[in-house]
C-alpha cells in the first residue's frame, strides 16, 4: 500500500531514486534509542532535514523521545505512520522510535525509502 502516488520507474532505470532503511535491533536497555538519536544527530550536523516520529501513546516525555539516560530529542507523536506521511515527505531523514508499535511500519518505510528517504527504525 502506498500513501502517495509515485511515477512508475523501471528497475533498470538509471534515474531511479534510491533511499535506504536502517534497522536498529537489540533487547531492552541495549541502547537502541541512543543509537537512533546518535544517527539522526549526525545527519542534522551534515545539514540534512530530519524528522523523528514517536509512538503517540508513549506519554512519558511529552513531545520528545528520550533515552534511558534522559537525553531527549523533539519528536512528532503518531499512532499510525500514514498520518504523518506528508510531514515525512518534506525531510531527507526519518527516524522512528519504538517502530514495533506502528502497525503500518513496513509499508511506510518501504514507501519512504522508494522516494529517496533514509529511514532509521
From Swiss-Prot:
The keyword Acetylation applies. It is an enzyme of class 2 (transferase). Disulfide bonds: none annotated. The modification N-acetylserine is found at residue 2. The modification Phosphoserine is found at residues 2, 13. It is found in: Cytoplasm. Pfam families: TK. The active site is at 98 (proton acceptor). Its EC number is 2.7.1.21. GO terms for biological process: digestive tract development; DNA synthesis involved in mitotic DNA replication; fetal process involved in parturition; liver development; protein homotetramerization; response to copper ion; response to cortisol; response to nutrient levels. Its main location: cytoplasm. GO terms for cellular component: cytoplasm; nucleus. ATP binds at residues 26-33, 58-60, 97-100. It catalyses: thymidine + ATP = dTMP + ADP + H(+). InterPro entries: P-loop_NTPase, Thymidine_kinase. The keyword Hydrolase does not apply. Phosphorylated on Ser-13 in mitosis. Phosphorylation of Ser-13 by CDK1 during mitosis reduces homotetramerization and catalytic efficiency when DNA replication is complete and intracellular TK1 is still present at a high level. Homotetramer. Tetramerization from dimerization is induced by ATP and increases catalytic efficiency due to a high affinity for thymidine. Tetramerization is inhibited by phosphorylation at Ser-13. Interacts (via the KEN box) with FZR1. KEN box sequence located in the C-terminal region is required for its mitotic degradation by the APC/C-FZR1 ubiquitin ligase and interaction capability with FZR1. Cell-cycle-regulated enzyme of importance in nucleotide metabolism. Catalyzes the first enzymatic step in the salvage pathway converting thymidine into thymidine monophosphate. Transcriptional regulation limits expression to the S phase of the cell cycle and transient expression coincides with the oscillation in the intracellular dTTP concentration. Belongs to the thymidine kinase family. Two forms have been identified in animal cells, one in cytosol and one in mitochondria. Activity of the cytosolic enzyme is high in proliferating cells and peaks during the S-phase of the cell cycle; it is very low in resting cells. This is Thymidine kinase, cytosolic. It comes from Rattus norvegicus (Rat). The gene is Tk1.
Amino acid at each position: 500500500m502506498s500513501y502517495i502516488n509515485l511515477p512508475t520507474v523501471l528497475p533498470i532505470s538509471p534515474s531511479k531514486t534510491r533511499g535506504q532503511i536502517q534497522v536498529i535491533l537489540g533487547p531492552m536497555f541495549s541502547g537502541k534509542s541512543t543509537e537512533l538519536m546518535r544517527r539522526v544527530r549526525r545527519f542534522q550536523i551534515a545539514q540534512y532535514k530530519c524528522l523523528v516520529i514517536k509512538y503517540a501513546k508513549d506519554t512519558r516525555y511529552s513531545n520528545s523521545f528520550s533515552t534511558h539516560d534522559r537525553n531527549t530529542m523533539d519528536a512528532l507523536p503518531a499512532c499510525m505512520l500514514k498520518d504523518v506521511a506528508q510531514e515525512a515527505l518534506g525531510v531527507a531523514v526519518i527516524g522512528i522510535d519504538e517502530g514495533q508499535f506502528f502497525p503500518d511500519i513496513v509499508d511506510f518505510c518501504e514507501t519512504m525509502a522508494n522516494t529517496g528517504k533514509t529511514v532509521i527504525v
